[in-house]
Amino acid sequence: MRREISFLLQPRCLLLLVALTIFLVFALFNTGKDEEKQVIEDHEITNRVFLDVDIDGQRLGRIVIGLYGTVVPKTVENFRALCTGEKGKTSSGKPLHYKGTPFHRIISGFVIQGGDIIHGDGKSSDSIYGGTFPDENFKIQHSHAGMVAMANTGPDSNGSQFFITTVKASWLEGEHVVLGKVIQGMDNVFAIEGGAGTYSGKPRKKVVIADSGEIPKDKWDEER
């Protein structure tokens, strides 16, 4: 009579199976981490801008943002120019500048949002192109805290409003154009969230961009 040997009953085979399982789990885990790292790091930073922030009239500190100008050049140019104020005024006479504007929406565990250069309450927006402009692309993901993206009222309605994530926000993919990431001052972003954030989004304190501008490349340090 032919004797059959079950694979699962052999000690050596059991050890082999366990080792193979551990190897596959480890490989899949590392692949996921590598892909996440690639999403975060593969985009070239073409410009650096800063936001100096006050809370209730007291200086909090600086947030430095690296911009992805090779991926979303039109969106980046709008944001960069609004940081410097170099484009003058809107058709209604308001400065095309983030300086002096508030973070009007601060949601605990989600985002800090600002950039309403018209009324400062989140109900209006404008751009250096005159009015709103289309979504450029959605190639960059909201992959971790510190991603900077355009706020909008629906498809192709980008203006001056933007937000900075305080968590990974993958549910926003395909709806908001990511244009950069915080490279210095993330502690200040969390301080804004913790000090003024609410679950409704209405700030508990007055948070204002006291100054903003661009950092020349010859002033960049080695940190990305």
Swiss-Prot record:
Keywords per UniProt: Chaperone, Endoplasmic reticulum, Glycoprotein, Isomerase, Rotamase, Signal
Reactions accelerated catalytically: [protein]-peptidylproline (omega=180) = [protein]-peptidylproline (omega=0)
Enzyme Commission code: 5.2.1.8
Pfam families, alphabetized: Pro_isomerase
Keyword Manganese recorded: no
Gene Ontology CC entries for this record: endoplasmic reticulum; endosome; Golgi apparatus; Golgi medial cisterna; trans-Golgi network
GO function terms (MF aspect): peptidyl-prolyl cis-trans isomerase activity
Signal peptide: 1-27
One GO process term, biological-process aspect: protein folding
Listed transmembrane segments: none
Residue intervals of the PPIase cyclophilin-type domain: 50-214
Subcellular location(s) per record: Endoplasmic reticulum
Glycan attachment residues as annotated in the record: N158
Tissue specificity field: Ubiquitous.
Function: PPIases accelerate the folding of proteins. It catalyzes the cis-trans isomerization of proline imidic peptide bonds in oligopeptides.
Family of this protein: Belongs to the cyclophilin-type PPIase family.
Name of the featured protein: Peptidyl-prolyl cis-trans isomerase CYP21-1
Source species: Arabidopsis thaliana (Mouse-ear cress)
Gene: CYP21-1
